[in-house]
Amino acid sequence: MISLTQKYELLTKLPLLQGISGKELAHIESVIGMEVNEVPPMSRPLIRQNDPCTHLIFLTTGKMIRQYKSDDGLYQTKSILQGPTILEPHNLYGLNCRFRCSYTPLQDVSFITVRKRDVMQHLMKAEIFRINYFNMLSAIIHKKEAQLQPVQGLTVRQKITSLLQRLFTDCSGQVEIAIKMTDLANYIGETRLNTSRTLNQLEEENIIELKRSLIIVPEMDKLRMKSEE
């Protein structure tokens, strides 16, 4: 159980709440609670892909494994999410209010959850929160637009690194994608042989690691840097 002082310090550091005055934040907290819940490491997802998104969920501390399985079932991605952050705030509203990924606590984690109704009735009344929320949604939209850029005219290497960057737009550390070589070649519109050769070259440069039907990128930041050279 954390003290009120510790709780206030925690709230002021959370995305979307930064910049809200102490008085306004104290009022919001007194109305909707914003209790900190702790969860130990788990072997199964705490939140599963396609679960309804009914709350705004702040991951305040700790790390979670984030996993996604494509709709066609041909590939799966895996990355690490580090608090403080928010779990898919863009899926709280819209036509399909469901989580796109599964989330499994990798270590002790803590959460603050706010019901959608309380977001609308209380948090949205704070101008700073609205500005922060709209800015976050805009950033997500811009990243998704970048993912849709055509890949025609690119080399095989550029197609592979571009695909990885589109899949892991908000990641800087280690990520993984489980996919068969043939399926990857089809995704980028190349032959299996050219795809395999290029992956081996990237591995020789220590940009990726290859295992059976698995590509590991130890550092996404390094891959982005090499892609710009």
Role assignments for model-derived ranges:
Residues P41, T60-T61, Q82, Q107:
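A cytosolic small-molecule/anion-sensing beta-strand core signal
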Residues Q165-E229:
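Phosphate-/nucleic-acid-contacting segments
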Residues V39-D51:
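Short phosphate-coordinating micro-motif centered on Lys-Gly-acidic
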Residues I32-G33, D51-C53:
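Short, small/polar residue-rich loop motifs at catalytic or cofactor-binding pockets
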Residues M1-P41, L81, I86-L87, N91-G94:
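Cyclic nucleotide-binding regulatory module and flanking cytosolic helices
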Residues T54-Q67, G83-P84:
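Glycine- and acidic-residue-biased ligand/ion/polar-headgroup-sensing regions
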Residues L106-Q107, M124-R192:
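Polybasic "coupling" helices that flank or enter modular domains
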Residues T77-N135:
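Cyclic-nucleotide recognition modules
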